[in-house]
């Protein structure tokens, strides 16, 4: 319990000993109690701990309260809720919410002062999840209509501070309700009102100058924030409908696609865009978008940021026209970079919005670099990491009174958010081009990024890992800028982080750093590192499992036999089989790739694997993968057989005994040959020595590890020549002659078996294939299979 030290405090409670025991007694002294707690956090805490929340909420049920008594109760309630909301959550009842809504519904007979404080309390109550769900589920239409009516007061009445503040509070409540239910009746009418209020508030700011300036600014930011939430909810709803359509048409299974994977929901379809615009904006969609671009040029940083947020939501959904997209590039992007030097709110938000725009978009990335991103971001990093004495915690009135951005209040949290936002922007800039990665390294960003891995903030650590992931996708940077970087120790430590998302992002960053040609590989390959990976394999999080197995895929590809064998020894046979049959398709694929890399070029590794998993069991596993008809499982499965066949004659014969497996390989080869288009052909030379996964991590691996704002492309499993090449290499390795001079009897017998299975005819069909790789390998295979002629 908080101690009350001054004499005034103690005398107040000595005179009123029952004030925290009976709601009637509290009501009797409500005015002196109000004066006692307001402006005093210590007294608020004392009152909360002594049961004031329950008593105040109980007062709602008293029907004979006067308007003044209700007002005083609401003022005290609002003051205590602003101090600590948690104690109110357990005592808040449905009837309390109904009492507040009833008060709001009688607005014609309720003074504006009373209405104002009622809306404040209601807005705070709606920040409780259960309260918001109850209101939106059972009273959605009525309360939304009431809030809409109050929100549009500035269009109906003469401007006053009360009118503006009621409109502001109503917009906050609408914002919260939209997050739970995006259906707001007549959508075009709602959006029209948002823009009308924004225009009205803009005019009032201009003509009334200081009188309404602050309240009008808050109203504009709240209106834009509500609009952005509304647009996001409708885009999400459209994605859900699109996903349902794809599932019903059999194009995708429910488990194969997240909503975030549908990047451009309109697929460049002008009719779909026009229909969506009409649903949301009515006939004035382009006019409203033009208004948003006008607001981008406003002097106020908060208004700029929120109008840009609305435009970026439309841009990422693919709703903007080519000319409007050009304005995002030429106007919005440079303005965002200039906002790096503006208010502290702008410093926290602008880099994150910029990251959304430039992520995986080389045109936008080039514009950002030309607009001075490198220097501006470096300035922000220095600002965020600089220790300053006596720095005051500060948020502008617009954002303190807004629900649009959930910004932290403390100096440390604000600087961490700035650091996180800048790191996400750096990660987004460096997703594609080595040129920009080199600029980042040359500008000395790496020490800041590495230090961010050690900061006590999950979001900052995750963002730093994102940067390392983007930078490490370049072979040049991997061998130069990152070569001497001290990243192994902090990254290995993050593999044991309590936060799963941090572990997952750190794992994805490590993936490229342990490639065979990486200078950092040896620093990672320690017993502790391997043990941590093996531990993470058993996690319930499928994304982390997949990424952990992907790292092992690179770890086992190397010349050091001890390092290569250790992971599989620690995994064990039963876990290995379990991972091959994991419920997550990505984990299955990566475990097969582990076995593919493990068996590459080494007879000892093949022998070790077959001691763990006998040939009959392995063949059964591979048969199931081939029967799945899924290319991401088929290719590594066949290459495992390719590597086993490259070992010795006995193993080739054991493969030849798997008739069902070989027939399925032949069938797949024929299907791939018929489906493959010329533009899908590989131009890379493949061989048993080079077929293992030695590429840098591709985009489909780190989809979930990109910045959370990103929307990713749907995975498409198109046929590719690698599957054909794998099948041809299997024939070559099975038929590889025992001696160079003339084919032995064993060679002829193996060739005869493959001929009888139909591989000869299959290879004949591939002689004129469009892919030069396929044609070259087919020549070799035919030379060996025709020894029986």
Curated annotation (Swiss-Prot):
Instruction: Name the principal localization, coarsely classed.
Output: cytoplasm
Q: Which GO terms describe its biological process?
A: negative regulation of gluconeogenesis; proteasome-mediated ubiquitin-dependent protein catabolic process
Quote the InterPro entries the UniProt record gives: ARM-like, ARM-type_fold, Armadillo, ARMC8/Vid28
**What does the subunit comment say?**
Identified in the GID/CTLH complex. In the absence of stress, the complex exists as an inactive anticipatory complex (GID(Ant)), composed of Gid1, the E3 ubiquitin-ligase Gid2, Gid5, Gid8, and the RING-like subunit Gid9, awaiting a substrate receptor to form the active E3 ligase complex. When cells are shifted to glucose-containing medium, the substrate receptor Gid4 is induced and becomes part of the complex, named GID(SR4). Additionally, Gid7 transforms the GID(SR4) E3 ligase core into a higher-order supramolecular assembly (Chelator-GID(SR4)).
| Keyword Cytoplasm assigned | yes
Specify the species: Schizosaccharomyces pombe (strain 972 / ATCC 24843) (Fission yeast)
UniProt key word Nucleus: yes
Pfam families attached to this UniProt entry:
Arm
Location in or out of the cell: Cytoplasm; Nucleus
- State the name under which the record lists this protein: GID complex subunit 5
Q: Which SUPFAM superfamilies match?
A: ARM repeat (SSF48371)
Q: Which GO terms describe its cellular component?
A: cytosol; GID complex; nucleus
Alphabetized UniProt keyword annotations: Cytoplasm, Nucleus, Repeat
Write out the function statement from the record.
Answer: Component of the GID E3 ligase complex recruiting N termini and catalyzing ubiquitination of proteins targeted for degradation. GID E3 is regulated through assembly with interchangeable N-degron-binding substrate receptors induced by distinct environmental perturbations. Required for the adaptation to the presence of glucose in the growth medium; mediates in association with the substrate receptor VID24/GID4 the degradation of enzymes involved in gluconeogenesis when cells are shifted to glucose-containing medium.
What are the ranges of the ARM repeats? 434-473, 476-515, 518-557, 562-600, 603-646
Q: Where is the signal peptide?
A: none
- Coiled-coil ranges per UniProt: none
> What does the sequence similarity comment in the record state about its family?
Belongs to the VID28/GID5 family.
Q: Which gene encodes it?
A: gid5
